């Protein structure tokens, strides 16, 4: 007998977007995994619980190599939620799904650091005068204010604009902003500004003790920071591929 559903109820389906990191492996894979290990060792827990999309569009690998790469990432607690740019022949049951239509954003790359070189710090170069032809219209920037400390393990993610924290950011916590990051307290965790492609974003904090800083995909870890900046009130900004810093009065 066919059962007739008399109380028809619609199923609510919503669209929603989330922020995920995109990893773009390079050959040879052993070398690239070594660089990934280096980043993870300098910022413990960076990938833990964070959704990741694997971009293999420019990678000449076969299915066996892709499966091995996914296994290696899994051993490093890197949770791959999808694969972008892969040929249909690369996929097999049990792999993360193919993804399309991602919005372009800057790559997050591990900076090359020469241990023999002292950390670069201090004031950046004087800004060149802005001519009228270079002036661009300024759009209003969205922002949120967090009125309490951000505890270890917590994340504040706001890709639409600036994030202001009235308090401190503990070690193991992170702030991710599409615009600038303002910390009215001690920054001990991670702060990522300009996360969706904003090279003019800045990071401000009352006391710098950060594990990791990033602006528009350019990273600086605790080991890369100048000792004279630690414990100071600091602002950081991007010049080319370098993060510049200066103390605030």
UniProtKB/Swiss-Prot annotation:
The keyword Cell cycle applies. Gene3D superfamilies: 2.160.20.70, 3.30.70.260. Residues 119-129 have a biased composition (Low complexity). GO terms for biological process: cell morphogenesis; division septum assembly; regulation of cell septum assembly. Keywords: Cell cycle, Cell division, Plasmid, Septation. Residues 89-130 are annotated as: Disordered. The keyword Transmembrane does not apply. InterPro entries: CAP/MinC_C, MinC, MinC_C_sf, Septum_form_inhib_MinC_C. Pfam families: MinC_C. Cell division inhibitor that blocks the formation of polar Z ring septums. Rapidly oscillates between the poles of the cell to destabilize FtsZ filaments that have formed before they mature into polar Z rings. Prevents FtsZ polymerization. Interacts with MinD and FtsZ. Belongs to the MinC family. HAMAP family: MinC (MF_00267). PANTHER family: SEPTUM SITE-DETERMINING PROTEIN MINC. This is Probable septum site-determining protein MinC. It comes from Rhizobium meliloti (strain 1021). The lineage of its organism: Bacteria, Pseudomonadati, Pseudomonadota, Alphaproteobacteria, Hyphomicrobiales.
């Amino acid at each position: 007998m066919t059962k007739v559903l008399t109380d028809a109820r619609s199923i609510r389906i919503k669209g929603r977007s989330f922020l995920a990191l995109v990893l773009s492996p390079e050959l040879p894979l052993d070398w690239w995994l070594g660089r990934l290990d280096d980043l993870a060792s300098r910022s413990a827990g960076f990938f833990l619980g964070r959704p990741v999309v694997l971009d293999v569009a420019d990678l000449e690998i076969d299915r066996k190599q892709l499966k091995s790469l996914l296994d290696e990432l899994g051993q490093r607690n890197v949770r791959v939620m999808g694969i972008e740019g892969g040929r249909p022949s690369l996929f097999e049951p049990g792999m993360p799904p193919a993804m399309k239509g991602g919005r372009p954003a800057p790559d997050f790359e591990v900076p090359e650091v020469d241990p023999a070189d002292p950390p670069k710090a201090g004031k950046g170069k004087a800004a060149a005068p802005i001519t009228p032809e270079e002036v661009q219209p300024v759009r209003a920037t969205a922002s949120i204010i967090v009125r309490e400390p951000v505890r270890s393990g917590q994340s504040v993610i706001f890709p639409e604009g600036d994030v202001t924290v009235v308090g401190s950011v503990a070690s193991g916590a992170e702030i991710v902003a599409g615009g600038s990051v303002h910390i009215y307290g001690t920054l001990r965790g991670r702060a990522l500004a300009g996360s969706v492609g904003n090279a003019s974003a800045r990071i401000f904090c009352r006391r710098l003790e950060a594990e990791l800083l990033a602006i528009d995909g350019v990273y600086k870890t605790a080991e890369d920071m100048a000792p004279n900046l630690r414990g100071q009130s600091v602002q950081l900004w991007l010049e080319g591929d370098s993060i510049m810093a200066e103390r605030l009065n």
